[in-house]
């Protein structure tokens, strides 16, 4: 059975949103930068997290392409229309198998996407993190992104 891995909340002012969540009593991690141009701050829970994310206007963001879901372009385009919950990530034991299943079910035909980066834990210590993502789309909810996240 899957569980919610994390919720992606798109915001124009990343530090302002982080400040709000901190004032609400959450521990908000430091700013991270993805190689595809987005920046985030994480609010970690035991088995899930909230990802506050933004797409700086000067970011070099790869475009969508056949078979390729551009995470950065999705966030940028979402923020041109609104702020809020932009994506729902479900847990995965095998993102490659998820991508195959999504294609068979007609809800995604995207190559899995893998990336690694250095992150910081809430206590400030450095950690290495790696993710494999499989993306799906819902034509009934085109402004909401769905993906599975294998960590």
Map each language-model feature to its residues.
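Short, extreme N-terminal leader segments that mark the start of a protein/domain
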Residues: 1-30
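Short, solvent-exposed coil/turn segments
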Residues: 2-4, 36-38, 142
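Vicinal oxygen chelate
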Residues: 3-12, 41-46, 49-51, 63-151
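Generic structural motif
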Residues: 12-14, 48, 55-57, 93-95, ...
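Residue-identity detector for glycine
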Residues: 16, 25, 29, 37, ...
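Glycine/small-residue-rich interface belts in oligomeric ring/scaffold proteins
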Residues: 19-77
């Amino acid at each position: 059975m899957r569980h919610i891995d994390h919720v992606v909340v798109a915001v124009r002012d990343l530090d302002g949103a982080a400040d709000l969540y901190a004032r609400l009593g959450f521990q908000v991690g430091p700013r991270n930068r993805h190689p595809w141009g987005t920046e985030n701050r994480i609010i970690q829970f035991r088995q899930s997290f909230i990802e506050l994310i933004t797409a700086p206007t000067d970011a070099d963001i790869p475009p969508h392409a056949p078979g390729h879901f551009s995470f950065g372009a999705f966030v940028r385009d979402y923020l041109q229309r609104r702020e809020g919950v932009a994506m729902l990530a479900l847990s995965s034991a095998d993102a490659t198998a998820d991508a195959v299943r999504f294609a068979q079910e007609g809800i995604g035909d995207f190559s899995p996407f893998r990336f690694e980066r250095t992150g910081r834990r809430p206590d400030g210590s450095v950690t290495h993190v790696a993710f494999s993502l499989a993306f799906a789309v819902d034509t009934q909810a085109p402004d909401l992104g769905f993906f599975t996240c294998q960590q």
